[in-house]
Structure formats: structure tokens, C-alpha cells
Amino acid sequence: HIKPFIETAPYLIVIFKKPYDIVDGKRIPNYYVNESVGIASGFLIAALQNAGLATLTHTPSPMNFLHEILERPENERAFLLLPVGFAKPQTKVPNISRKAPFEVMTQYF
């Protein structure tokens, strides 16, 4: 499938996860890898948007080619691809506002 945003974005951020470390030739598992990398990716996306940049998440399948062409160690796996740049002038970015606290919470006294 052709994804023009991959070719036109001025920056591509590839986020890798590290499911295990290698210490003295032994695999040592890292716990909650997907959760940790997912949360960190969310912080990065929020910061990019706060800086006025546009991005979207892309998870090509398979992603092994990223591991190979970027020459990453065997214990790293591509997690997410973020094309980053300024939105084109004709792009319609949704004007999303937060709900007021009383709309989403219940207080108990």
C-alpha cells in the first residue's frame, strides 16, 4: 500500500521497544515493555502536537525491515513509526476541546 505521508514528512521517528537485555550472553527480560513504550510514545505525540507539529501513528506490517535497515541490535524491535512535520495548509485538523471535569467525574463525599 502506498503511504504518501511517509515520503513527504520531513522527519520519521522510529520508536523501538527492547523486550530483553543481553547480559553476559544471557537474555534478561524487561517487564511491561509495550505499556512503557506506549505511554512514552503518547507523551512524545502530545509534545509534538503542543509544539505545533502534525503526526500520526503508523505500524507497518511487518516491521522487521526497520530493524534491518537501521541496523539495530537483535534485542530491539520496531514498535511505532511517527511521520512528523507541519500539516499541509488544506489539512483539516479537528478542533478538539477537553470536557469539563463535571462531565467525566463523579464526586463522593
Regions found by a protein language model. Give the residues of each.
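GST superfamily/GST-like fold recognition
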Residues: 28, 32, 53-65
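Glycine/small-residue-rich phosphate/adenosyl-binding loop
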Residues: 1-37
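C-terminal helix-cap and adjacent tail motif
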Residues: 77-109
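Short secondary-structure boundary segments
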Residues: 17, 60, 86
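Short hydrophobic alpha-helices that are characteristic scaffold elements of the AMP-binding
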Residues: 46-50
